[in-house]
């Protein structure tokens, strides 16, 4: 769902992403035999506003999601309305396997945020998701989740080597103190560790009030935590002929009160300088477990070049 990629609330940040380019869409469709369909984010939100409020609240409540006490019935209703409007589009199209929205930069069209909706669509229909309309991550999530069936999360990666740029962006005072900071990163997206479905996080999953100033005051986000332990970062490269894998660990979760990073994943890996050179995107997928060898086999099936940073 998008209308004007590159324009909107923070065009100076979002002006150009490769996944918005016509070349990206056409290459993706040709390479993988899939179809990428754009639908209006503005129109689906206008339709959401027309949906009966009681029906929308009942729909949300039927999901039995853990919610912070600060999340109001009005916020739940807005989520339910948008969910039902999106379901109308899905039913009309048919055969939808993945979904996303340009939700941050075009937040002016929306009174809520779609994070909780992605959870419902995944739980009910197995539809995978991406944040910010990142179709490269959507494709990566679809292929790798359905191949590995391991818990996966999309997030922003902030290597400590990025320095002040990351600290400023998340409004934190400093990175956590560690012995080898060149080999650490924070995983943060929209105020928390990033979105993952409830089934991947157990009890460490809750609907929370929004954090970022860019979104509507009635918006929400999910505070969730993947299991601590082995993980890989992985994503298909924009060339669509290569996949980059970074083995490491989810070491713990760290909190920064009164910032844009209330709960972040602390990621530890090897060869941080190489990661800075070759990481294909700041949007990364965290996949739980020791998945390096399995992804190598997936790469053979798809004919991808396979790069491991370790």
Task: Walk through the language-model features, giving the residues of each.
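Conserved, well-structured core segments that form the ligand-binding/active-site neighborhood
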Residues: 1-150, 154, 158
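Conserved anion/nucleotide-ligand pocket segment
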Residues: 1-17, 166-197
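Short, surface-exposed linear patches
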Residues: 28, 58-61, 120-124, 175-179, ...
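The substrate-binding groove and active-site-proximal loops of carbohydrate-active enzymes
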Residues: 74, 196, 201
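C-terminal functional extensions of proteins
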Residues: 84-87, 138-163, 278-302, 308
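Aromatic/acidic polysaccharide-binding cleft in carbohydrate-active enzymes
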Residues: 109-112, 154-170, 178-179
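Short, highly charged low-complexity linear segments
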Residues: 159-167, 199-210
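Extended hydrophobic packing segments that form well-structured cores
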Residues: 202-310
């Amino acid at each position: 769902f998008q209308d004007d990629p590159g324009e909107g609330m923070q065009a100076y940040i979002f002006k150009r992403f490769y996944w918005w380019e016509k070349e990206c869409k056409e290459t993706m469709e040709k390479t993988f035999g899939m179809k990428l369909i754009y639908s209006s984010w503005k129109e689906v939100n206008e339709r959401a506003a027309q949906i009966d409020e009681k029906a929308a609240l009942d729909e949300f409540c039927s999901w039995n999601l853990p919610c912070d006490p600060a999340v109001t019935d009005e916020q739940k209703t807005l989520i339910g309305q948008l969910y039902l409007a999106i379901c109308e589009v899905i039913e009309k199209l048919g055969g939808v396997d993945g979904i996303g929205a340009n939700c941050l930069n075009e937040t002016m069209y929306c009174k809520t945020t779609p994070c909780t909706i992605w959870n419902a669509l995944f739980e009910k229909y197995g539809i995978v998701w991406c944040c910010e309309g990142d179709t490269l991550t959507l494709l990566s999530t679809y292929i790798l989740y359905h191949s590995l069936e391991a818990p996966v999360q999309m997030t922003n990666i902030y290597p400590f080597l990025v320095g002040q740029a990351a600290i400023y962006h998340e409004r934190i005072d400093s990175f956590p103190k560690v012995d080898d900071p060149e080999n650490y990163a924070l995983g943060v997206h929209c105020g928390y560790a990033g979105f993952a479905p409830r089934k991947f996080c157990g009890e460490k999953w809750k609907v929370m009030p929004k954090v970022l100033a860019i979104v509507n005051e009635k918006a929400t986000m999910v505070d969730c935590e993947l299991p601590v332990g082995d993980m890989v970062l992985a994503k298909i490269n924009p060339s669509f002929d290569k996949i980059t894998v970074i083995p490491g660990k989810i070491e713990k979760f760290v909190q920064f009160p009164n910032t844009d990073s209330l709960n972040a994943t602390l990621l530890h890996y090897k060869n941080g300088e190489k990661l800075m050179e070759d990481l294909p995107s700041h949007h990364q997928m965290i996949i739980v477990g020791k998945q390096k060898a399995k992804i190598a086999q997936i790469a053979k099936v798809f004919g991808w070049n396979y790069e491991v940073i370790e």
